[in-house]
Amino acid sequence: LDISQVTPGHTLVVPKEHYRNLLEMDAASASQLFAQVPKIAQKVMAATKAEGMNIIANCEEVAGQTVFHTHVHLVPRYSADDDLKIDFIAHEPDFDKLAQVAETIKNA
């Protein structure tokens, strides 16, 4: 369990091998980590009777990472008024710009 308990049952899935965050993990190690995530998440959901769950991996300080060892947060959700706030601000799409960004990512 995460000692901060953003919501009751807030759990961390942590690999034994050290990686700063998911961005440093090789595919095999990431696959091993994420093979466990649904199994543990299902148990947390069953045990807590939560209505939903956020599954979060913060990568680097600007994204909220404060512990620099890879870990995945499983945050049970009970209502929209709990202590976890994640806001995605929708923007009017510029499809030309989206195509440019997609092409840049594809070629990276």
Residue spans of the language-model regions?
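HIT superfamily nucleotide-processing domains
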Residues: 1-108
